[in-house]
Amino acid sequence: MKESFLIDVLKKGVSPFHCVEAAMQTLEKSGFEELEYARPWNMKKGKAYMMNHHGTTLYAFTVGENFRADAMLRMAAAHTDYPYLRIKPNADFVTDRYAQVNVEVYGGPILNTWFDRPLGIAGRVIVRSKDVFAPETMLYRSGRPVLIIPNLAIHMNREVNKGVAINNQVDLMPVADMLSEEQQSTDYFLSFLAEELAVKKEDILDFELNTYCVEEPAYVGIKETLLSSPRLDNQTSVAALLAAIVEGTRTDGINLIALFDNEEIGNTSKQGAASILLHDMVKRIYRSLGCSEEETDCAMYGGMLLSVDVAHALHPNHKEKMDITNHPVLGDGFCIKEACSQSYATDAKAIGILRQLCDQNKIAYQRFVNRSDVRGGGTLGSVASTLFPVRTVDIGIPLLSMHSARELMGRTDFDALASAVTAYFS
């Protein structure tokens, strides 16, 4: 898989809305037809389909030319969101002529990495329409730095290098501009949005906007073996799944990807992995293809799911944070993740399937398990497989600096991940 494809996704996916938009553009070029869940479906063998759910979640699937109800249902899921700062309504406030924007924290970012960085704004804006039940949606991306969170100088904060607690409401408020005395009472943020979108300020009804790092991905290292970028968690997985659903060669069954939102805040939303939509959607696919209720149930519960999200790599300055025998490094392939707590949904049979696929196709992989005295994180696999109880395996690219404003990966690991998911879909 070409690395340029990953770079393109990373550059475009500055919000979950833009991530889904970029994914749909990729799929449309490959012949995927868009469906709406509230309208009738007319499924055909040999076709490919996609469905946008509330703007930040995307489902896409292919129906094999030689489709059989008893062929294994193969699914893979990732997430479109990442930790960021979300702009609140009534965002404007002024501090001694500093124009500032009120924000809240989404997910679990490493907060100090967002200081002193040029930040853009991206997301969607809802605009007044003639039909009150169908307001207009406009995607917005500033495309340039419009915010910055300045650090307090060390002369005023002598203990900063010993570690200082960050107050989300005090320390994270970005600066948007310097105002004149006359401007201080104006509604400057909505005025800015209205001008950018060429709409009337009073027609802006609401918005869902987040900050993003405007710096682009960069190759790092003497031999450039590393890639530093915002949003590697989890757009590496999004890009791998898009590549695999397009390049998979399977002709006898259903291949499906789900790109969920809200993983970083627990998955429990209408567009998250805890939604019943994946289960209901798969049932509808099989019934649209003329399968009986019995055939549909058999297909659904005989399926398999790859839960694709990033893993922790061994940190060279903190080897003590990793398990003593299962500690992946950058550049040695993607990770198979497991935890007996089921924070990862992986089981031995699923690992057996995946390892055989990788061995047959000479794809590099590693094993990841947390230290026995560290709780570790979780991801969407355990949530999705609770609601849709199929065999599941958690996999992903190993990273350093996870949840930092910029994260770090080994460049060859994306190809390993994309190749593994493509083999699964072939």
Where are these regions (language model features)?
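N-terminal hydrophobic/helix-forming segments and targeting peptides
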Residues: 1-426
